[in-house]
Amino acid sequence: MQERYLRNIPALTEEECQLQQQKRVLVVGCGGLGGNLISILLRFGVGHLRIVDGDVFETTNLNRQLFSSIPALGHNKARIAAQRAGNINPDVALDVVEEFLTEENAQTLLQNCDIALDALDNIPGRRLLAAACEKAGIPLVYGAISGWVSQAALSMPGDRLIETLYPEDTVVRDKSVLSFTPARCASMQASLCVKYLTGRPVETGTIYYFDLLNQEFETIPMV
């Protein structure tokens, strides 16, 4: 057991730590949610991360996106995340894809992955990723944030969770996000991911909803 992972034990067993080092995780989006997810999973020590984002950092990202900084403005988010990743855990293998998720590349991005993490900020992309995971038979960890609130869930093939949550005509009007909201949501997403990868019991098709303004938490079965 490498020294860097010793504080994961006994919360995780040594066998679980070794198991997750064999896993391949896709993270789509390297902004508010994605930056936190990538950092968490690097520190956990998953074996392989494929990180995807075609966007560049802008000034409006500085309030919440972990890998944003003044020097990073104008640079691709996935590329900057990869640079930071090497300083966090160089033992994790990285695939860096400086592209947006599209119908044309979705199945290629999912190839050989054990699970996909939704760190997107738009509904069409979220629906596209969910449909691709359904087709590939790969579980999806969903996360969404707005203002003070966030929600996360593990969706297995056949759940159709994203279709239920986001019909085609769904419109998001509030695009404000506070700095702590993506960190909270990403923590829940990462915990669902790690439990799935290590074979621990985990609820699927259940929304975990957090309201940090009113300190409220709800568990909402959806399937």
Which residues make up each language-model segment?
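N-terminal charged helix/coil linker that caps or initiates catalytic domains
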Residues: 1-26, 144, 164-165
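Glycine-rich phosphate/adenylate-binding loop
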Residues: 2, 109-115, 119-223
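Conserved N-terminal Rossmann-fold NAD(P)-binding element of oxidoreductases
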Residues: 27-29, 52
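Hydrophobic/small residue at the entry helix of a nucleotide-binding pocket
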Residues: 33-34
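Hydrophobic residues within alpha-helices
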Residues: 37-38, 81
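Aromatic pocket-lining residues of Rossmann-like dinucleotide-binding sites
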Residues: 41
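Glycine-rich phosphate-binding loop and adjoining beta1-alpha1-beta2 segment
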Residues: 46, 51-88
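A structured beta-alpha segment of the ubiquitous adenosine-cofactor-binding alpha/beta core
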Residues: 74-115, 120-126
